């Protein structure tokens, strides 16, 4: 009653809390609350052997155990959106435990003073994001949908092999050629909508039986198809110390990486079965589409031209990154890639007559490169869109929808994100002691 007489409108003399809808944001927030603890235990054994004067062998194995204990809310939201407290009434605890053995082997063979051969074989893990493994679900009765995290996700496991040839010459500098391969099992990905067929809500997803015939909005799982990635890298570093006069201060570095990958991304379509009459029967039809590995550019290039003379040092560098496959999606037109990215940076420093004192100038993103993400699809209402593209696409009836999207120029695809960072200039003094 004190709150009532003090003018707090959220409390009245009514027998129930009639202003509950004003607290919708509070219960909605509580739904996504969670608590968690992660425990990592690692043990390893390693041997470092020199066999003769030319061969070095490093081998070992790491045993890694991970135990996660997470608590999250589960529940049902009824047809009235403001009664969301039901979605935060059940606190569930889930404990996950997994153990992996990660062997590694490194070989180095100095064939000659100017030639070194290297080999590496490693096994690495990619663990799921913690928000993806919470024991959380929120069922919408009105929309017949389920927000769902998947506590059964397991880490993706990658077997990596690298071959490296290094040539080192006093005038040539250091030239390294690398070939690498990766085979990834259990890559975590988003499969989009997933229909819960009758009788599988509890057995497959750990959901209440009444969630049968609902749809999971964003279903994340481990990819059942193995993924192959391969590529090569060229790295070159040199100083032109043998040139006459002031040219001997020139420095040049270059690095180029090329990768290719092929991934089968599972794709589930929800089909209607009319053969049994009404009510209709829904079924998941599982297939896949092929694309690149997500978050992996096809090309990366770094170039750096520098000059060192007495107390002066300067570097002009360029970074080029090819387009990156950023986001999977059930709908081909909503899959996203970035535009190719190129930026220039400048770094200068000069030692001053005071011991330990130097002046520096750093200019980042000189050309003011822009980050742009694009959908595969296009926006025909864009004033810059060329209508002739529509005619070309319509005439290619024998091609798949993916092939038609490949015909669209990148500049005509709809933007999903555009970020302008501009250039930054830092001028200052640094004192080291």
Where are these regions (language model features)?
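C-terminal beta-signal and adjacent terminal beta-strands/loops
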Residues: 320-328, 350-433
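Gram-negative outer-membrane beta-barrel transporters
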Residues: 181-183, 200-325, 430
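Residue-level signature of outer-membrane beta-barrel architecture
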Residues: 49-51, 55, 107-110, 123, ...
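Transmembrane beta-barrel strands of outer-membrane/channel proteins
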Residues: 59-65, 117-123, 175-181, 250-258, ...
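Signature of Gram-negative outer-membrane beta-barrel scaffolds
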Residues: 1-112, 138-139
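Flexible glycine-rich, low-complexity coil/linker segments exposed to the extracellular/periplasmic environment
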Residues: 1-31, 194-222, 283-287, 385-417
């Amino acid at each position: 009653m004190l709150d009532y007489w003090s003018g707090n409108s959220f409390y009245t003399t009514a027998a129930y809390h009639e202003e509950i809808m004003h607290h919708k944001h509070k219960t909605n927030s509580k739904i996504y609350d969670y608590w968690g603890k992660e425990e990592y235990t690692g043990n390893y054994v390693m041997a470092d052997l020199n066999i003769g004067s030319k061969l070095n062998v490093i081998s070992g194995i790491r045993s890694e155990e991970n135990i996660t204990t997470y608590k999250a809310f589960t529940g049902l939201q009824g047809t009235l959106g403001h009664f969301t407290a039901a979605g935060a009434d059940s606190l569930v605890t889930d404990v996950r435990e997994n153990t992996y053995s990660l062997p590694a082997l490194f070989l180095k063979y100095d064939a000659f003073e100017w030639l070194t051969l290297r080999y590496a074989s490693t096994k690495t893990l990619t663990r799921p994001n913690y928000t993806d493994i919470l024991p959380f679900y929120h069922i919408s009765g009105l929309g017949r949908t389920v927000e769902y995290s998947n506590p059964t996700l397991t880490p993706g496991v990658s077997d990596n092999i690298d071959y490296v040839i290094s040539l080192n010459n006093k005038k040539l500098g250091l030239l390294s050629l690398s070939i690498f391969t990766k085979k990834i099992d259990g890559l975590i990905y988003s499969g989009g909508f997933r229909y819960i067929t009758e009788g599988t809500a509890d057995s497959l997803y750990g959901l209440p039986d009444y969630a049968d015939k609902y749809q999971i909005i964003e279903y994340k799982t481990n990819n059942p198809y193995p993924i192959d990635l391969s590529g090569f890298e060229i790295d070159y570093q040199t100083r032109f110390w043998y040139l006459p006069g002031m040219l001997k201060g020139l420095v040049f570095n270059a690095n180029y990486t090329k990768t290719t990958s092929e991934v089968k991304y599972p794709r589930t379509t929800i089909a209607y079965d009319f053969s049994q009459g009404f009510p209709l029967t829904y079924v998941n039809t599982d297939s896949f589409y092929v694309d690149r590995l997500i978050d992996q550019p096809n090309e990366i290039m770094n170039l750096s031209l520098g000059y060192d003379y007495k107390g002066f040092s300067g570097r002009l560098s360029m970074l080029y990154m090819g387009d990156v496959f950023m986001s999977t999606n059930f709908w081909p037109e909503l899959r996203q890639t970035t535009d190719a990215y190129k930026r220039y940076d400048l770094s200068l420093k000069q030692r001053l007559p005071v011991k330990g004192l130097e002046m520096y100038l750093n200019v980042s993103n000189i050309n003011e490169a822009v980050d742009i993400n694009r959908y595969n699809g296009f926006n025909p209402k864009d004033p810059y869109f060329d209508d002739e593209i529509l005619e070309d696409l319509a005439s290619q009836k024998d091609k798949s929808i993916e092939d038609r999207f490949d015909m669209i120029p990148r500049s005509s695809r709809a933007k999903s994100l555009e970020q302008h960072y501009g250039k930054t200039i830092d001028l200052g003094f640094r004192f080291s002691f």
